[in-house]
Amino acid sequence: MSRFWSPVVHRLTPYVPGEQPKLTNLIKLNTNESPYGPPPGALEAIRAAADDTLRLYSDPTSERLRAAIAQAHDVGMDEIFVGNGSDEVLAHAFHALLQHDAPLLTPDITYSFYPVYCGLYGIAHQPVPLDDAMRIDVDDYRRPCAGLVLPNPNAPTGIALGLGQIETLLRAQPDRVVVIDEAYVDFGADTAIPLVRRFPNLLVVRTLSKSHALAGLRVGYAIGHPDLVEALNRVKDSFNSYPLDRLAQAGAAAAIADREWLARTTGKIIKTRIGLTSSLRGLGFEVLPSQANFVFARHPDRDAAHLAAALRERAIIVRHFRTPRIAEWLRITVGTDEECRVLTDALGTILTRNAD
């Protein structure tokens, strides 16, 4: 701490990002990155954009990228906001749309950046407990609030809501913004984007970090009513009018345009996830029904922290949270078939040795 810090900084509990080891000989299954490289067209577009024009500022409106998003999702350009990763998009949404007198509602077990934003912007926060099956009960969100923020699928559980449940929430809270964070939606859940035209209080936030394999590029976007998008732009232009550089805009536009690559790659990950779930259950793990690019699992007879440490000794990294209610769970990114085979073989060895 420092006497130069503001009171807000003194009160902050910052987000703790997933570990990014410098070693290269690891099986890295801890931060839900894609096991496959980015779309080739995205890499080509980035190389082509790395020219003399980098001396110029990037397009502050990201028009080319927004056009690609509009075509991919059949929405208008004025319904799209883009930012430097979905984390920045979410931060602007919290700042622009969710600061009210009543508390903001989020699940109690969810993306841990949400309470950080609340602390940063002075937003009262009311976590809503998941049920005993680790599911979101939409009836629990029928209460006075500043708004709702729900990831779909949820993280770290991987469990998704159906569109009917999301529509129920939107109808129950017509005067509050409902933010649906779709970071993992391409791995089997239904997007809420078709509901945007019917519900002016809906903001859908997405990222290219997961299904498009561009975590290192930092590109996210939101789709919603033009009034919501205008609010986000007002905050952006009061903070940083140029959030996306030229390379990011070019690469992201090319990635979004390649729908065939997206379908093929997410299909491979879904298939591997099904196999990984089956293998883990065969080892005695309880595995939640995931529609994301990770699984959430626990073993009834083994300590999760011990399992994570034992895997690390074998150069395999998974995510263990020490948070109440989930301290006995591991979140495991779906890697390649071979990476998942090595993981389950290692777990089999660990469990057998512990049993002796």
Swiss-Prot record:
It catalyses: L-histidinol phosphate + 2-oxoglutarate = 3-(imidazol-4-yl)-2-oxopropyl phosphate + L-glutamate. This is Histidinol-phosphate aminotransferase. Its EC number is 2.6.1.9. Belongs to the class-II pyridoxal-phosphate-dependent aminotransferase family. Histidinol-phosphate aminotransferase subfamily. It is an enzyme of class 2 (transferase). The modification N6-(pyridoxal phosphate)lysine is found at K210. GO terms for biological process: L-histidine biosynthetic process. Pathway: Amino-acid biosynthesis; L-histidine biosynthesis; L-histidine from 5-phospho-alpha-D-ribose 1-diphosphate: step 7/9. Homodimer. Its cofactor is pyridoxal 5'-phosphate. SUPFAM superfamilies: PLP-dependent transferases (SSF53383). NCBIfam families: hisC (TIGR01141). It holds the Pfam family Aminotran_1_2. It comes from Gluconacetobacter diazotrophicus (strain ATCC 49037 / DSM 5601 / CCUG 37298 / CIP 103539 / LMG 7603 / PAl5). One of its GO terms (molecular function) is histidinol-phosphate transaminase activity.
